[in-house]
Amino acid sequence: MTDPNSKAPRLQGRQEDKQTQTPPPRPPPPPQPPLTPRPDSSPHQNSHNKPKPEEEGTDGGPPASQGDRKRSKGDQGPDTGPGLGPGRAPSPKPTPLGPPPGPGPRRSARLGPLQADRDPGEGPQVPAEGEVEGHPGGDQGHPPPTPPAPHNGHSGHGPKVQQPEGPEGREGHEEGAVGGDCGDEEGHPPPPPPPTNGHEGGLLSSVASLLVKWEGHFDQLVQSIQDDLEDYWKKLATPQ
């Protein structure tokens, strides 16, 4: 039979051997590729870090400069115009036409280039004084004003006939006063007395005579009404 206490020192000896034993060395890391240097940002290289190929001329000569290439397109330059040789001078530019002489309406900025093509002599016609749209020539197209219509005698604005002063004129005033009383009975006011030559004395005398006549007629009318009322009361008082 084995002693159980004999296993304990063996296990302890194995644990001590594991602690004292060194681990195996790690494998070296894989080699990394070499880093490419960053290209310097220069105006002669494009975005792909590739140098531009040297441009050669069409006939195999040295590369043309930028100014020569610009001149070769249409032969345009500071001394040559489009389609002209180097020896010919460019034609002068047409100057814009100025405003036509004389007063005229204001031109807007949008209509400026359109109206500049017109002849300066064909400026807008300025309307003369008194002319209106649709009526050229001022008062030439308008007919003269029509005279007012004459008033008839019934409206009361007709011509007034002057009556001579004296007894004949007074008789005429009396007849007019009688006619005025008849008009009062019908509901129309009496016509005003006509003036006599613009003299205040004659006018006052005619007005006074008319007032006297109207007062007499009024008294007669009142007296007749009173007589009729008395007769009416008498008829009512008498038995039938």
Swiss-Prot record:
GO terms for biological process: symbiont-mediated arrest of host cell cycle during G2/M transition. Residues 22-37, 89-104 have a biased composition (Pro residues). It is found in: Host cytoplasm; Host nucleus. Residues 1-204 are annotated as: Disordered. Phosphorylated by host ERK. The phosphorylation triggers a structural change that enhances keratin binding and protein stability. This is Protein E4. It comes from Human papillomavirus type 5b. Belongs to the papillomaviridae E4 protein family. Contributes to multiple aspects of the viral life cycle including viral genome amplification, suppression of suprabasal cell differentiation and egress of newly formed virions. Induces host cell cycle arrest at the G2 phase by associating with and preventing the nuclear entry of host CDK1/cyclin B1 complexes. Inhibits cellular DNA replication by preventing loading of host replication licensing proteins MCM2 and MCM7 onto chromatin. Within the cytoplasm, associates with host kinase SRPK1, a splicing factor regulator, and inhibits its activity. Keywords: Early protein, Host cytoplasm, Host G2/M cell cycle arrest by virus, Host nucleus, Host-virus interaction, Modulation of host cell cycle by virus, Phosphoprotein. Residues 67-76, 167-176 have a biased composition (Basic and acidic residues). Assembles into oligomeric complexes. Interacts with host CDK1. Interacts with host SRPK1; this interaction may favor expression of late viral transcripts. Interacts with host cytokeratin components KRT8 and KRT18. The major E4 form is first synthesized as an E1^E4 fusion protein from spliced E1^E4 transcripts, such that the first few amino acids of the E4 protein are derived from the N terminus of E1. GO terms for cellular component: host cell cytoplasm; host cell nucleus. Its main location: host cell.
